[in-house]
């Protein structure tokens, strides 16, 4: 008992002995919030202790305080206050998520993997999970796992499940969601596409210079479920004129294919078209100058 009390008190731990939590779903980035944290630690030091658990090799795995540790190292501190607390993997994962979801700005990908990590940890602890559709397991807790997560974070269980769907997106598309190039609702529908179809979708997005709306994403999902979503289908759907985008010029893939060798990819076709348009523009400018 005395050993547990000794471990749970605040200790000064060298930064060199701290390691990030494995599978940490949150990024440590140099944004405005990090700048404020760094400035505060530079002036006042680390006021709120980190929480870490001891490892077998004598180091300490950070559970809460990755950003504080990063900022402390950036300003030249060699040690930081840490509450050392032994805990199993499931408890650690839940604490990692709960301590980070309170941050100001959280990317969709961060929230998605955080919810997934917490749901899996709760499942391992014996909570019932309803993430698998069509499940027939007996409910062993008063609330479903996703409902418990949502209640803690102030969102519905359906919102939790939809965020977790985003973890099925390939990294390139998930990055577009984080950058607000693809909206959340279409992204959820796109998560049902197979990985190879998502890679084709990247080509279609690059070729048409358009991203799918919710209705377009739902159609792509339906095509995938009905036997496969081809690149040509994707290009044709994305090339459609959307509401609020009526001045955009769009072409169907078959209208362009006849002008190019069969081996040409959408990217190659796009490069040729832009090159020809550039030449045409220069010719018009020369004609006007005469």
Task: Please annotate each region the language model reported.
Residues 26, 35, 70-168, 192:
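Amphipathic, charge-rich alpha-helical segments that serve as recognition/docking helices
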Residues 11, 46-48, 102, 125, ...:
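Glutamine-centric residue-chemistry signal
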Residues 1-85, 91-105, 267, 284:
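Short, charged/polar connector segments at secondary-structure boundaries
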Residues 153, 157-275, 279:
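Amphipathic alpha-helical extensions and coiled-coil-like segments
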